[in-house]
Curated annotation (Swiss-Prot):
Task performed by this protein: Lipid phosphatase which dephosphorylates phosphatidylglycerophosphate (PGP) to phosphatidylglycerol (PG). PGP is an essential intermediate in the biosynthetic pathway of cardiolipin, a mitochondrial-specific phospholipid regulating the membrane integrity and activities of the organelle. Has also been shown to display phosphatase activity toward phosphoprotein substrates, specifically mediates dephosphorylation of mitochondrial proteins, thereby playing an essential role in ATP production.
UniProt organism field: Rattus norvegicus (Rat)
Domain Tyrosine-protein phosphatase: 37-188
Protein name: Phosphatidylglycerophosphatase and protein-tyrosine phosphatase 1
The UniProt record lists the keyword Hydrolase: yes
Amino acid sequence: MAASAWLEAGLARVLFYPTLLYTVFRGRVGGPAHRDWYHRIDHTVLLGALPLRSMTRRLVLDENVRGVITMNEEYETRFLCNTSKEWKNVGVEQLRLSTVDMTGVPTLANLHRGVQFALKYQSLGQCVYVHCKAGRSRSATMVAAYLIQVHNWSPEEAIEAIAKIRSHISIRPSQLEILKEFHKEIAARAAKN
């Protein structure tokens, strides 16, 4: 790993709890500063912040979540979220696609894996909770890829659709670039068929 990547990963670890506390604060405060913990994007996908253990019952029973796409690194979910085994015990499959917080970009392969995972649950009439720490960047990138595939939208159209529902998403330029690559691959496959 290059020195800059080590620094970025280290910075993400140092800032994890302070930024998580900020996310919790924004979820609990009233008025214009309030941010909902998660939002339903369509009949299959919910986009949100860390699915805390206390939310499990609501996600499974009220939202019909049977799949969880975790864009976090393992250390981010170690103490506050269900383990893969705990998810399995309540009938939920977890797919972990580890991506560094703040500076990370999901790989093209992971975007494809995540979209196929969501489509599997879509075909079963069940829901998928896609998350990172705050539900703003890494997970929003994954949800944009899902919308690109499902609706044949451009990356910009997908991001705009998400932002209309969850206005505080933040797709960085490097994440937009990977979405453009994803879109190009999806369009090329569609042209072959």
